[in-house]
Design a protein with these regions (language model features):
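ATP-binding N-lobe of GHMP and related small-molecule kinases
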Residues: 1-102, 106, 114-124, 156-158
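Alpha/beta catalytic cores of group-transfer enzymes, especially the acyltransferase/condensing modules
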Residues: 126-161
Length: 161
């Protein structure tokens, strides 16, 4: 079992300049820090005795045979992106509710990617972890968010991006 603890963040200056549509034309800079509130992901391979191959637990519980059947968009896209089809059980717990404005969805995505890369015994740099999370949420899921959330979640602490 792998357990990740990924921080939530507070943006102090420059929020909005991290949107691709802005920084590609004008540049951008963001000052943010992570706080002592976290997203926890517990992930483990699911033994083959169960009728389902994937169990995802968050505010809901999902059971399915294939990742494409998941309703949770970030979890579905992470499993698809990493091409994981082994039996898998994932539990999410957070110190704060979703939509808190503190980058919770990005912390979830970074934490899940980190857990699954670790389970696969694949090292990934913090930069690449943040970039994968950006690709998933901004490009594939087309969420209207900037990049600071993913970088803050991956690197933690006080940062200028």
């Amino acid at each position: 079992m792998i357990i990740t603890r990924t921080p939530f963040r507070i943006s102090m200056f420059g929020g909005g300049t991290d949107y691709p549509g802005w920084y590609r034309e004008h540049g951008g800079a963001v000052l943010s820090t992570t706080i002592d509130k976290y997203c926890y992901i517990n992930a483990r391979y699911l033994p083959p005795f169960f009728e389902h191959r994937i169990r995802l637990v968050y505010s809901l519980i999902e059971f399915c045979q294939h990742s494409s059947e998941l309703d949770h968009p970030s979890a579905r896209e992470v499993l698809k992106f990493l091409d994981i089809e082994n039996g898998l059980e994932i539990h999410y717990d957070g110190d704060l509710p979703g939509r808190s404005g503190l980058g919770s969805s990005s912390s979830f995505t970074v934490g899940l990617l980190n857990a699954l890369h670790t389970m696969s015994r694949k090292y990934i740099s913090l930069h690449d972890l943040a970039e994968e999370a950006c690709k998933l949420e901004i490009e594939l899921l087309q969420k209207p968010i900037g990049k600071q959330d993913h970088y803050a979640a991956a690197y933690g602490n006080l940062n200028v991006f």
